[in-house]
């Protein structure tokens, strides 16, 4: 009996020294297969056993921030320390249970992270990850407030400091992936379809990426301002273009950083190398997916602009074309004569090479003592090309555009205030406003031409280019906006019943634009151009008094404002794509001026 008592006493002492399992009491007991703990003979209560949040096996305690078993603890530790990357052969929703946890290591690691296991706890079990996230965001915020060129360096230095504190081989991506709460149920926490932030990023990564993109953009703007201050002689670009470029650069930088984070946090390949996060290039597939989605959005918006116009043209499809369009009479052969003369003409883009620049320009006051235009100079009669089958509409548009631009320049050369200018000044003014002049001519001769056919061909050409993958989406958007602007402008002037004299004055107001002459040596020439523009405005005001007073004048001038946004490249693409080829309209304008003199147009 004494030996039995001693043996019983030793066993009770050993059980007292063992760690409690499942919240058992300090009294002796033996674990039972059912999951409970057998208490003493007098105890009737049975305490429940905690289960692993990952696989559902019996948990041995809280490991790396989550209640888990020894198997999942060891698996998570090996994956983090060895920086292992897994791939799922299924749909990334494999079952992770006690008996099937070894089938898919990828889904098992994902469920470990979703259950609350922290990768930084593998190295530093007593330092929570929340403090480090706040430290990284605070470091990035301090670098943004400091400004200057050290914004990105402060961000990177702060990031490297935290990496050194964690030790080698630690991963920011694996660290920030453990976002769900610890006490959430496994079925609710592990749901791959509930991604709040884009591309699988969490709040900390998204905040860091956007903040770093802002810092980089501010740094680029400061460098651009500093470089611009040292070169005052360089002509500055349009402020609106600079603003658009900066917005595009900022968007591109932000997309690249987001793609870096997405590629490093790819759900199919976990990357635990934190040193490659700020310098790794985005994968081709990720950047291609982002860029293609943005391109489709731009193209879709551009095509949406054209849809109401196309619907209106279809409703008005019964509009009859003027008899001139159906006649089989050939044109006068003016363009053929021009082409024949261009073959024997020396290519002189400066129109005689007179480069006085307006510094010694003498104003002839006699032109201001008479009317700017006469009824003959305001008349605009274009001979329309033959309108045949619908599949030849593109040739109709090209031929119409060429006749309009030739007739516009020929009409302007008869105006005395335009004849006073030197040849290179005439070219400079025409190059700046020729898209707006074509819009004026299209609205003036809408009774002679089939304007619905032209607008309909613009819509068809834009839709055809939208189906080509190599065409830039911005080009599609410009063409769609230009089509809408031309359509609205023609419709508005048609409702106002504008006279030929008013059309001629509007043409002079657009052409004599002093903002096109910004060089210092063109000061006297700029004053002359401003006087002509003011004289044309006063003449238009008097014309408006005849037809409707001050209100009509204000309406006509307001209709000119959208014409300043017409894009020259888009206008060339819509009107002259099949006619001039690779030669731009800026290069053709000097030839048209010379041929209008030599051929007697």
Swiss-Prot record:
<dbReference type="InterPro" id="IPR013088">
    <property type="entry name" value="Znf_NHR/GATA"/>
</dbReference>
<dbReference type="InterPro" id="IPR050274">
    <property type="entry name" value="Nuclear_hormone_rcpt_NR2"/>
</dbReference>
<feature type="zinc finger region" description="NR C4-type">
    <location>
        <begin position="88"/>
        <end position="107"/>
    </location>
</feature>
<dbReference type="GO" id="GO:0050829">
    <property type="term" value="P:defense response to Gram-negative bacterium"/>
</dbReference>
<keyword id="KW-0479">Metal-binding</keyword>
<dbReference type="GO" id="GO:0004879">
    <property type="term" value="F:nuclear receptor activity"/>
</dbReference>
<feature type="zinc finger region" description="NR C4-type">
    <location>
        <begin position="52"/>
        <end position="72"/>
    </location>
</feature>
<feature type="DNA-binding region" description="Nuclear receptor">
    <location>
        <begin position="49"/>
        <end position="124"/>
    </location>
</feature>
<dbReference type="InterPro" id="IPR048246">
    <property type="entry name" value="NR2C1/2-like_LBD"/>
</dbReference>
<keyword id="KW-0597">Phosphoprotein</keyword>
<dbReference type="GO" id="GO:0045089">
    <property type="term" value="P:positive regulation of innate immune response"/>
</dbReference>
<dbReference type="GO" id="GO:0000977">
    <property type="term" value="F:RNA polymerase II transcription regulatory region sequence-specific DNA binding"/>
</dbReference>
<comment type="subunit">
    <text>Homodimer.</text>
</comment>
<dbReference type="GO" id="GO:0030154">
    <property type="term" value="P:cell differentiation"/>
</dbReference>
<dbReference type="GO" id="GO:0006355">
    <property type="term" value="P:regulation of DNA-templated transcription"/>
</dbReference>
<keyword id="KW-0238">DNA-binding</keyword>
<dbReference type="GO" id="GO:0000978">
    <property type="term" value="F:RNA polymerase II cis-regulatory region sequence-specific DNA binding"/>
</dbReference>
<dbReference type="Pfam" id="PF00104">
    <property type="entry name" value="Hormone_recep"/>
</dbReference>
<dbReference type="GO" id="GO:0007424">
    <property type="term" value="P:open tracheal system development"/>
</dbReference>
<feature type="region of interest" description="Disordered">
    <location>
        <begin position="214"/>
        <end position="249"/>
    </location>
</feature>
<keyword id="KW-0862">Zinc</keyword>
<keyword id="KW-0805">Transcription regulation</keyword>
<feature type="domain" description="NR LBD">
    <location>
        <begin position="329"/>
        <end position="596"/>
    </location>
</feature>
<keyword id="KW-0539">Nucleus</keyword>
<dbReference type="GO" id="GO:0008270">
    <property type="term" value="F:zinc ion binding"/>
</dbReference>
<protein>
    <recommendedName>
        <fullName>Nuclear hormone receptor HR78</fullName>
    </recommendedName>
</protein>
<dbReference type="Pfam" id="PF00105">
    <property type="entry name" value="zf-C4"/>
</dbReference>
<keyword id="KW-0863">Zinc-finger</keyword>
<dbReference type="GO" id="GO:0005634">
    <property type="term" value="C:nucleus"/>
</dbReference>
<dbReference type="GO" id="GO:0035002">
    <property type="term" value="P:liquid clearance, open tracheal system"/>
</dbReference>
<dbReference type="InterPro" id="IPR048245">
    <property type="entry name" value="NR2C1/2-like_DBD"/>
</dbReference>
<dbReference type="InterPro" id="IPR000536">
    <property type="entry name" value="Nucl_hrmn_rcpt_lig-bd"/>
</dbReference>
<dbReference type="GO" id="GO:0006357">
    <property type="term" value="P:regulation of transcription by RNA polymerase II"/>
</dbReference>
<keyword id="KW-0675">Receptor</keyword>
<feature type="modified residue" description="Phosphoserine">
    <location>
        <position position="327"/>
    </location>
</feature>
<dbReference type="InterPro" id="IPR001628">
    <property type="entry name" value="Znf_hrmn_rcpt"/>
</dbReference>
<keyword id="KW-0804">Transcription</keyword>
<feature type="region of interest" description="Disordered">
    <location>
        <begin position="140"/>
        <end position="183"/>
    </location>
</feature>
<dbReference type="InterPro" id="IPR035500">
    <property type="entry name" value="NHR-like_dom_sf"/>
</dbReference>
<comment type="function">
    <text>Binds to direct repeats of the sequence 5'-AGGTCA-3'. Inhibits the ecdysone response. Plays an essential role in regulating molting of the tracheal cuticle during larval development.</text>
</comment>
<feature type="compositionally biased region" description="Low complexity">
    <location>
        <begin position="215"/>
        <end position="226"/>
    </location>
</feature>
<comment type="similarity">
    <text>Belongs to the nuclear hormone receptor family. NR2 subfamily.</text>
</comment>
